[in-house]
Regions:
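Extended intrinsically disordered, low-complexity coil regions enriched in Ser, Thr, Gly, Ala
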Residues: 34-70, 100-101, 156-182
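Charged, low-complexity intrinsically disordered segments and flexible loops
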Residues: 173-201, 208
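Extracellular receptor-binding modules and their adjoining Ser/Thr/Gly/Asp/Asn-rich linkers
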Residues: 1-36, 77-163, 167-168, 195-226
């Protein structure tokens, strides 16, 4: 089956990239950054990302609608001080506009409605694989193509705690994170665990705990030429 006109195909709406430099040992850095995508009709897009780095993990941790924009926050963790720099590429996909006009060399229409269901000029969301599991893994795809991953389910575990610091009469809050992330080296997808620790001082006492979700699922998307 090549085309099913019962479904609305997704096509590329916007894209962008950001270079991330591995900080020096002891250098202060912010472990997250954001990018913004203009929305169509107030509906958030489907986001695929490609992190080109052997050892730097990047993954979407938060997204929010702000006006007519979809603002996405990406968490990243370098291997300090000798890790590779990283580049994050992001791709935003929306349903194809229904039209009877096609401009590509190959155009398929529903013969009853005259609506275009495929146009070779459009950059469709091309899903080539689904990677699911609960532990680190590696997958290889044909060379000469460019791939990105789209998270459908994220595996994570976060444990929080509060400790009273008597010498400063304050509480220290901490959180230990483990998140499964996807990173690319050429056409090889590496699913790896990323561990991070957050801490702050002066937060009032609260109840610590553990929150987790077991199991991940990523779509592998061919974005060659996009």
């Amino acid at each position: 089956m090549l085309v099913d006109d019962s479904y609305e195909n997704l096509t590329l709406h916007a894209k962008g990239s950001q270079f991330i430099r591995t900080p020096a040992l002891g250098e202060t850095y912010v472990p997250y950054f954001t990018f913004s995508v203009p929305m169509i009709g107030g509906v958030p897009p489907a986001i695929a990302i490609r992190c080109e780095s052997r050892d730097m993990g990047m993954h979407i941790v938060h997204s929010v609608i702000s006006g007519n924009n979809y603002v996405v926050t990406v968490l990243w963790q370098p291997n300090i001080p000798n890790g590779d720099d990283g580049i994050l590429y992001w791709y935003a996909f929306y349903p194809t506009s229904k039209t009877s006009r096609g401009t590509g060399v190959v155009v398929l229409r529903n013969r009853h409605t005259n609506i275009v269901t495929f146009d070779s000029d459009l950059k469709y969301l091309r899903v080539v694989d689904v990677i699911s599991g609960s532990s680190e893994t590696t997958a290889n795809y044909p060379a000469g193509r460019t791939y990105a991953s789209m998270a459908m389910r994220i595996q994570y575990r976060v444990q929080t705690d509060n400790v009273y610091l008597e010498h400063v009469d304050a509480w220290r809050w901490s959180a230990d994170w483990d998140i499964i992330s996807a990173r690319w080296t050429g056409s090889t997808l590496n699913i790896r665990n990323v561990s991070m620790r957050q801490a702050d001082q002066g937060i009032p006492n609260g109840v610590g705990g553990v929150w987790q979700q077991v199991g991940f699922s990523f779509l592998v998307v061919d974005v060659t030429g996009y």
